[in-house]
Amino acid sequence: MSTTISPALFILVFKTSIRFDIDMPHIKMVLSTISGIARWNFDRHDADNILRIESAANVSREVIAALNHNGYYCAELED
């Protein structure tokens, strides 16, 4: 799901396989390599382990590729 909340800010929502706190330092490192991400957070209490990203550009492909490359499942949730 990709929603623009202002001219320069996208909200991207992903289903992931990331379930554990121990993964967070690695996820932080992976996401820090993607330019334009302003904020991100997880809802691991949701069955889909939701990753929510606020970014200056639509970085969906980069996020999916980076997480998949590091062994995590990641798929964008569509509107």
Regions found by a protein language model. Give the residues of each.
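Short amphipathic alpha-helix segments
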Residues: 17-35
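Short amphipathic alpha-helices in soluble, non-transmembrane regions
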Residues: 26-31, 62-71
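Conserved short beta-strand edge segments in small beta-sheet-based binding/regulatory domains
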Residues: 41-42, 71-79
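Surface-exposed aromatic
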Residues: 46-50
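Short glycine-/aliphatic-rich beta-strand segments at the starts of folded cytosolic domains
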Residues: 2-20
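Helix N-cap motif at beta-to-alpha junctions
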Residues: 55-60
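Short, ordered beta-strand-loop transition motifs
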Residues: 5-6, 43-45
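Short amphipathic beta-strand starts and helix->beta connectors
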Residues: 1, 32-39
